[in-house]
Amino acid sequence: MKNDYSKWLLVSDIDGTLNDKSMKLPSVNKSAIERYVENGGTFTLCSGRNLQSLSIHYNKLGIKTPAIFLNGAGIYDFDKSETIYFNPITSEGEKIILDIFSKYKTLQLTVFGTDIIYLATRTCIYGYVISKLDKLNHKLCKKTDDLPRGVWGKVSFFGTSRLIRKIQNLIKTQYNNYFDCFLTSPFTLEVVNKGVNKGAGVEKLRCILDISSENTAAIGDYYNDIDMLKTVSHPACCGQAPDDIKEICEYVACHCNNGAVADFINYLEKNYIL
């Protein structure tokens, strides 16, 4: 395997991994990615962001590999400008989500389609803020009946940490056959169709690219990255990741502010590629 970058697939999370905590791309990461790709390596992103949001960061890297969006719900081929895989929440799942939402008055709901973020009612501060930060296409739906159907790549619940834990437990105990869910912060719970996760997305992409599983690597920083880290042969996390994330990783890189992706690329080159 030595000196053959073309046999390798490296996948990175965006927030708190590729980018630093101020949501900027460290120059050391960009340089390392460029070197890795120029030598024949395959690099891409896997994020909970929707396609429009992911594209902002993808386009800075000069890569062409299909990317994984909405936590594995979709894969987009930028070279062909087409979605090559999309697995949204089912119609029955949509009804369950809306039923949960209706029972908790302080709960906020954001629905993520491939290119549009739908904000359920005027109280959706979380969805509004993330839409404004990256100037993303969004639509305010004053009534849940106004939410489109069949395009729910993922939904995000926002509330107090106590309420979010309650919703997480509810979904895992009563609706486990319909959804997978994971915390992206103490206040946000993301919900996707059953079987959808970053790991499944990476595995699907690996098969599409016909890359051996033993030459797959990924780096992340939080609990929504666990499936991805468990799927690849060489998992890494950023230095600021929770301790239980570090325990499942082969390599713990530096803090994301200092260029964790570059650190991991250097590790892979030193130990496996060069």
Model-derived features with residue positions:
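Active-site metal-binding loops of divalent metal-dependent hydrolases
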Residues: 14, 49, 221-222
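Hydrophobic packing residues within well-ordered alpha-helices of enzyme cores
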Residues: 29, 54-58, 167, 171, ...
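Short, structured coil segments at secondary-structure junctions
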Residues: 61-63, 71, 79, 175-177, ...
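Conserved acidic, metal-coordinating active-site core of Asp-based
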Residues: 104-219, 223-228, 240
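Alpha-helical scaffold elements within enzyme catalytic domains, especially in hydrolases
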Residues: 35, 99-100, 170-173, 244, ...
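Active-site phosphate-binding/coordination module
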Residues: 24-126
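Mg2+-dependent phosphoryl-transfer enzymes with acidic/Ser/Thr/Gly-rich catalytic loops
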Residues: 2-9, 25-26, 190-274
